[in-house]
Design a protein with these regions (language model features):
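Short linker/helix segments within small regulatory modules
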Residues: 34-47
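Short flanking/linker segments adjacent to small metal-binding domains or redox-active Cys/His motifs
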Residues: 72-111
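A short linear boundary/processing microfeature
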Residues: 36, 68-75
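Short hydrophobic alpha-helical module
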Residues: 12-23, 36
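Short, charged surface segments at domain edges that flank catalytic/cofactor-binding sites
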Residues: 1-16, 41, 72, 84-87, ...
Length: 111
């Protein structure tokens, strides 16, 4: 993975898991919203920074709950463009994650 892409994702996350909102530890993963098996690439819009547990270990994790994850934009179908697929943030806001590292807010969340 390109270090600049990984760094942009980490900067966007601002030290927090992008699914639960808690502070990140050193035990985190860069999750492909459009899975590699679905044609997903290493792009800023396609990657989110998450706790290892939120990624694939805990009962509430992305991979163990694909329907919830797809509804929240944490996982994206093969025909979808991650940069154009809404993503639900921990505060409830609904955003588009862009490849330049910016976030376009569609619906404001709780502050």
């Amino acid at each position: 993975m390109d270090k600049k892409v990984a760094q942009a994702v980490l900067e966007r996350a601002s030290g927090h898991c992008e699914t639960c909102g808690w502070s990140l530890t050193q035990d985190y993963a860069l999750h492909h919203r459009k899975l590699k098996s679905r044609g997903g690439k290493d792009t800023v819009a396609n990657l989110i920074c998450v706790h290892h547990d939120c990624h694939n270990l805990a009962t509430y994790s992305i991979h163990l709950n694909p329907e919830k994850s797809e509804a929240k934009g944490w996982m994206v179908n093969s025909w979808q463009d991650p940069a154009e697929t809404p993503f639900v943030r921990p505060d409830g806001s609904i955003v588009l994650l862009k490849d330049d590292g910016t976030i376009f807010e569609l619906v404001k969340g709780n502050e």
